[in-house]
Curated annotation (Swiss-Prot):
Main location, first listed in the record: cytoplasm
Gene Ontology CC terms: cytosol
Species per Swiss-Prot/TrEMBL record: Syntrophus aciditrophicus (strain SB)
Enzyme Commission numbers on file: 6.3.3.1
Reactions accelerated catalytically: 2-formamido-N(1)-(5-O-phospho-beta-D-ribosyl)acetamidine + ATP = 5-amino-1-(5-phospho-beta-D-ribosyl)imidazole + ADP + phosphate + H(+)
InterPro entries: PurM-like_C_dom, PurM-like_C_sf, PurM-like_N, PurM-like_N_sf, PurM_cligase
Pathway: Purine metabolism; IMP biosynthesis via de novo pathway; 5-amino-1-(5-phospho-D-ribosyl)imidazole from N(2)-formyl-N(1)-(5-phospho-D-ribosyl)glycinamide: step 2/2
Family: Belongs to the AIR synthase family.
Gene behind this protein: purM
Protein name (record): Phosphoribosylformylglycinamidine cyclo-ligase
Subcellular location, record wording: Cytoplasm
Amino acid sequence: MREQSSYKDAGVDIDKANLFISRIIPLIKMTSRKEVMKGIGGFGGLFHLDLKKIKDPVLVAATDGVGTKIKIAQMMNKHDTVGIDLVAMSVNDIIVQGAEPIFFLDYIAIGQMDVERNVKLIEGIVKGCQEAGCALIGGETAEMPGIYSENEYDLAGFCIGVVENGRIIDGSDIRVGDRVIGIASNGIHSNGYSLVRKVIFDKAKLNVDDTIEGIENSIGEELLRPTRIYVKPVLNLMKSFNIKGIVHITGGGFVDNIPRIVPNQCCTVIRMNSWQIPPIFSIIQELGDIDQMEMVRVFNMGIGMILIVSEKETDDIVERLNMLGEKAYIIGSIEKADGEKSAVSFT
């Protein structure tokens, strides 16, 4: 008699997948908005855009992942925060356009179904969606033995936001004399981890459980600090102030991200002594013998989001941000570009 084959024998356990879905449905409901028309389980998520609130809507889409920060989560066997990172990376990209994130979808690629671990991943995604005020309306968990090893996984997120046409923030109103406000990050966030891992684990031979002078947590805990979500404070600001430009400091740091929003006839001057750079960055720089320009091109250096505003509104905006629980600093200004200056310069 020939031996029968099954999907489970091939490494894909449908029963475990169904158990996972049953576990996460109550979590996902915690992110629901009134515009969500149907619960999880359909072939696609349904979201009814309310045209009474917004008359000429423009949809804004963003997608991102968490990068090799996932390796730290796997080393720590701590999986409840990288979901926050996943949401943050996309919703922060949405808000810089002046758009409100309204719904989110996730994609989890795994080698083998680990229900408890995957529930932790969704718990983080749910928390991130709650912080951003957007609904988790769908997702995909792809079990792919042979592509990923048993304990490996990867994450991708997709977010849609909406903004009134005519209120899109695109940097076109930025002028010489405008001020640059930096909002504090929560550590490294989700970029630069390939360099971080090379320096800390390969070069310095440290472990996730080790401690370093100047940092209260273990190395692993410090590196897993979740990316800060700036949606609610920025939405609050947009109701009262003219925010001319917003920059999410992600891959490319200050050097590559600021020019994406500042007009070519302007340059941005950043004063590096205007805020306290968290110790983790100086530790990485020292252990890795990393050049300062490389640091500001790879890492956020303690500033997760930048606002460009008129001089007259600067102090009031900083005061509002502090009132909202954000640490905000005036970190620079917009100057006239010339042939000798870089698009972003540091003093």
